[in-house]
UniProtKB/Swiss-Prot annotation:
The keyword Repeat applies. Glycans are attached at N203, N281, N339, N583, N636, N835. This is Apical endosomal glycoprotein. Its main location: membrane. Probably involved in the sorting and selective transport of receptors and ligands across polarized epithelia. Residues 64-222, 269-425, 491-644, 654-809, 811-969, 971-1138 form the MAM domain. It is a single-pass type I membrane protein. The lineage of its organism: Eukaryota, Metazoa, Chordata, Craniata, Vertebrata. Residues 1173-1216 are cytoplasmic.
Amino acid sequence: MPLSSHLLPALVLFLAGSSGWAWVPNHCRSPGQAVCNFVCDCRDCSDEAQCGYHGASPTLGAPFACDFEQDPCGWRDISTSGYSWLRDRAGAALEGPGPHSDHTLGTDLGWYMAVGTHRGKEASTAALRSPTLREAASSCKLRLWYHAASGDVAELRVELTHGAETLTLWQSTGPWGPGWQELAVTTGRIRGDFRVTFSATRNATHRGAVALDDLEFWDCGLPTPQANCPPGHHHCQNKVCVEPQQLCDGEDNCGDLSDENPLTCGRHIATDFETGLGPWNRSEGWSRNHRAGGPERPSWPRRDHSRNSAQGSFLVSVAEPGTPAILSSPEFQASGTSNCSLVFYQYLSGSEAGCLQLFLQTLGPGAPRAPVLLRRRRGELGTAWVRDRVDIQSAYPFQILLAGQTGPGGVVGLDDLILSDHCRPVSEVSTLQPLPPGPRAPAPQPLPPSSRLQDSCKQGHLACGDLCVPPEQLCDFEEQCAGGEDEQACGTTDFESPEAGGWEDASVGRLQWRRVSAQESQGSSAAAAGHFLSLQRAWGQLGAEARVLTPLLGPSGPSCELHLAYYLQSQPRGFLALVVVDNGSRELAWQALSSSAGIWKVDKVLLGARRRPFRLEFVGLVDLDGPDQQGAGVDNVTLRDCSPTVTTERDREVSCNFERDTCSWYPGHLSDTHWRWVESRGPDHDHTTGQGHFVLLDPTDPLAWGHSAHLLSRPQVPAAPTECLSFWYHLHGPQIGTLRLAMRREGEETHLWSRSGTQGNRWHEAWATLSHQPGSHAQYQLLFEGLRDGYHGTMALDDVAVRPGPCWAPNYCSFEDSDCGFSPGGQGLWRRQANASGHAAWGPPTDHTTETAQGHYMVVDTSPDALPRGQTASLTSKEHRPLAQPACLTFWYHGSLRSPGTLRVYLEERGRHQVLSLSAHGGLAWRLGSMDVQAERAWRVVFEAVAAGVAHSYVALDDLLLQDGPCPQPGSCDFESGLCGWSHLAWPGLGGYSWDWGGGATPSRYPQPPVDHTLGTEAGHFAFFETGVLGPGGRAAWLRSEPLPATPASCLRFWYHMGFPEHFYKGELKVLLHSAQGQLAVWGAGGHRRHQWLEAQVEVASAKEFQIVFEATLGGQPALGPIALDDVEYLAGQHCQQPAPSPGNTAAPGSVPAVVGSALLLLMLLVLLGLGGRRWLQKKGSCPFQSNTEATAPGFDNILFNADGVTLPASVTSDP
């Protein structure tokens, strides 16, 4: 009998998850020396599992990587104190400000390894060690991302232990940057076993947390043996094939050193500096180093290249800045038609000003006297020895000069100089034939003429005419020289000049950027004469992308754009991108979307306003040995309108519907998270036309790692003393962050408006008044800031407009950013305050908006010394615009424990009339007030506090909201206009998730019911929550009612909708009662449900004031599935009618045979699997449960607490 379709996946999950089963696919029993050696000997690569990486990572796609999403990949904490490493996500296990999101997923559901805060009085070190690894190739590179929460970690080190020696591959220096930072270190050739260790050290004064994520081992495996090699390749003794240029290059490419044996390389002249300089001559400036770098010399190499050991020797330049150290070779005889090749290893780190140059100095009669520059490397190449090679053909005797010049805080190093067998010293051939007549070679020149300082200007200054332009004014997009020389090598170029516009290659791998002619290129279709920048082969040993950079640039203006022509012909792994390098951070500004098939295309990139210094970098990767003549090129690079003083007509266009472009608005560049100009993405439609453009911030974008994103206007001159900025915003998603509006003026920033959390799947209008000093012409900027404190949802903006004059009163006011134009009156004084310090003289400890002490509200002191008994203090709004239909104004109010008096509410239209009077109950709870409003003219609302003459009393207001439609009854809502009095505040302890509001007619990226229950059509609305965002074992989202009075018996009636794809996916909906007595679960439904609306009724009883809570959570495997609510009705003082039969208790027609057959099969499985299978069957299935309380509530003796230990705040209490 076939297995029932819904039992098979459950059985698989059971077998995989049972503690007695350890199922690992297809072990091929590789020998111990073949395990964790970066080579997949098993077909499924199981011999490389739990090696500090896995054989394949579906998230990263790197060959050997660990993202910590499933497990620690074999990494083990070996700390000897309580300061230790652990696997964590969202800072849940750390006592301190750990990362709120990982690097892999960029959300709070992703995992990483972290070490928490240190409480001890002495320094402690937390160590995380890899399993034993074996045989790293010379090209091996470890790439990872690290995060320091508060920038105060004393030290982070990456160490490699091999035999009795422990090498420090990298050690943190200087201040920590914000967010996740990338780190890449090379291991060098490691023979035999080794381990990698991450060590974090702190002392008693340092706090914060450090985390690691996305470890990747690149190009670490040795080549595999081959029966036959491609033509021209060398067949090693161990049957490995290596390319001919890898012979005698100072590296063990074969893995058995047979490519470096004396038989092959005996005639090469190799200098490793272990015993001296060999045949090379030293001038002042080079020092042979016997000790690796340490804390006193953080930029120096920590190991040599020859031995890959801290005990090895190498050369470093110790010359004074501005004075190069020169190393000269022996004199060589003319090479004739054969190439004299020099392989050398260079180390440039710690400074962008470091430089290593290789010159050819010809000798003898008739030879040119000036040295010829053959190779130059400048800038930061990282903490690695980088291979290079130069081939020399000379008709004259010659010398090779190596000139090293250090920059501030940097180092230039040399190791392993290897001259090929065609480099024949003069002393070697002099015994065979006499030297030609003529003068002897002169001493090497200290500097070639091309590198001498110009005129009398200081080092780094540019001489033009009578000017000495300082370095900070070079490439600042403002011409200082009459001929513009200071802006000529600043990125703009057609590559016809050899200077290439200042672009300089900084590649360290097997690819490089090189200026070539069109005839040289085989990858592009260009046929005309000319030059461009092209990806070409290089001599580096590392498998890294090619990089080429501009000099230091900036500052730039908001209109700055880069225009370029490019081609890309590549397989899927290849790419071409433009990166902005700013103060150590790297921002992806542009990427070729697809291969151009070798056809030249043009594009432009908005760079925007940036501080100095920044650099532009083209990054490329292609497989030049792959099929289809792969390649990439860049030409006609132009930087336009980059001066900060450049203005255009568009700069004054603050009002914008984003249909044509973004007008005067441009994205900030402080992080990798950006606002993007899009069409019908995120929100399914724009606000202007329903089919047009808007600007979008999506925190789920793969590259959105930054904490916030800025959208700025260009500087504006006030058109009037008061202006009104209006805009439409869309803030939607189960865990979306905060949207803010601010104004910058003269270095100060003023917050004008903000919203947090989902506002429903619709566009909302908002406005803010811009106040300027009369007669002032000081420019200002407007700033929309999207905070990435949530990871599921979208933010969008559309239809921004500015007009003279003040704005209407806002429809919503939380008092978080301002007093919303309210003005005090009467005897007392209302004021806006927060209780963050805990020392406020009066007022509630927390606000209602955020339910934290940092939140703001309006409060008035009603104590006798501030407001005598019977006296009033009024708070009057600005004018509201006329209403086209009846509306409901809701607000939350709070009274002191001792009687605060009375709160009256008035409406001012043609006259003033009272619409509401509330006796402000004492207690710790915020309470909801509501009033129906009809106004055909402009109107105001007035809140008036009447003092009761009681000391230490107050009245507070928060969260005023004006919505269309009549006010609902307490605890009831049909969700047609919104959530009514139900609060969906995201609780951080539950993961920060929120219920949302939407309807079937509005497309959403989240699943939802096609129709509501109220109208039964897609035009209706409901509250819903998508449980799939919670993840495995996830937390919950709450929808809470307003505080309701104690009741002996009342009825809660509602309709709910649940839909999940399979039976073993399980969403849960619960009804909780929350009061000062605790939390009680009174109803719940879980498991698979038909996609239809179902009715539920719950008897409610509580001896204390309480709130009703709808809790949505996920009880099983993650799955896309919504839980929705509609037509919630709270019938105070009424018993529920007899509930309809639960659909969970009704068998579906035709299901009996399947059940019987499944039962028989399960019976056989029980015999085989024993008690473990029976336990699983007992847990299988889920039915609605309901707990009916009696009229005399017996107390919360069966209090329900969440498994994650969330402590819920006492938001309601009883009256005193």
